[in-house]
Amino acid sequence: MELGISTFVETTPDIKTGKVISHAERLREVVEEIVLADQVGLDVFGVGEHHRQDYAASSPAVVLAAAASQTKRIRLTSAVTVLSSADPVRVFQDFATLDGISNGRAEITAGRGSFIESFPLFGYDLDDYDELFEEKLDLLLELQKSERVTWSGKHRPAIHNTGVYPRPVQKPLPVWIGSGGNQESVVRAGLLGLPLVLAIIGGSPQHFAPLVELYYKAAEHAGHDASKLIVASHSHGFIAEDTETAADRFFPSTQQAMNTLARERGWGPYSRSSFDAARSFEGALYVGDPETVAEKIIHLRKNVGITRFLLHVPVGSMPHEDVMKAIELFGTKTAPLVREEVSRWEASERS
């Protein structure tokens, strides 16, 4: 089982001081976080794309490239790339460049985008939300197949037998589909034989098990070898030396971030009782000491079918030293527990 970190590189006001960290400082911090994740043996680090004041990473590939030359093994992925409002040629070129710098460690996670600020910014109509994604994913996958491409569509000028460079080290450059749980997205990923990332950030993770099953059925129906496909979970969480400390440190920034989204999207306020329910064993928050978080990840593997887990930390803005400690604990204490038990369980399932 692969284990890693994801972040949106937020720059919201510090919950205690009210200070807002600059985009530049937060970007430098996240590079340090990626380097540490590599040092403690985590498998993957993801950076999400946003185009608003309270998020610093509008170009995940650039952030990941800054870390690529300072890391040796960790895979580097977007989390996600808002493909619907991007030019697939530039996306491919950016991540092929990252793949070269990292010597074959780049990945793209393509999503439609739960944040929509990039659509008006780049001149796209939200009425074309689904059509844009389908067309641009089609082009991105064509770019994987061959050096020279001929392609035409509705929302981008046609390409006529044109070479697209640089070419990636990996053949093909990995493309994942990111989904919040939409059945259509899950089926699309399965039919295309692409790995899937599920944003499991609310409710019970157990409710995603039918979607994982649907994904594998779609893949098999299309003739793909389901045993070679991966389903990942992107889930909020935080690790500290003891569970109550983890909860008390993680809640304030999480509440602030969730209430900001609540005001924008018409949700109800986020309370401590909601937070505590979500960090229960059946909930979608992975908050606690290393052993508690390990138990929940193991449960997710055994009962939902997740084979890559991304701990999304921080939610909102937390002190950099707290995030670094959480990454250290994840790599040195939680990850070994998960890997040992999952390896034992998978061996018993095969026998």
Write out the residue ranges for each language-model feature.
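Acidic (Asp/Glu)-rich catalytic clusters
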Residues: D38-Q39, L64-K72, F95, D99-A106, ...
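Conserved, mostly hydrophobic/aromatic
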Residues: L3, A37, G41, E49, ...
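An alpha-helical appendage that flanks or caps ligand/catalytic pockets
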Residues: I5-V9, D128-V164, P205-T307, R339-S351
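Short, well-ordered coil/turn segments that N-cap beta-strands
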Residues: M1-L3, L42-V44, T71-L76, I101-E107, ...
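Short, acidic/polar
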Residues: E25-L36, D94, G180-V187, T292-H299
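N-terminal beta1-alpha1-beta2 module of alpha/beta enzyme domains
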Residues: M1-R75, K171-L173, S348-S351
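Glycine-rich, proline-tolerant flexible connector loops at the mouths of alpha/beta enzymes
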Residues: V44-A67, V82, I200-G203, H312-V323
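Internal, glycine-rich beta/alpha segment that forms the wall or movable "lid"
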Residues: I15-K16, S84-L194, Q206-A209, E213, ...
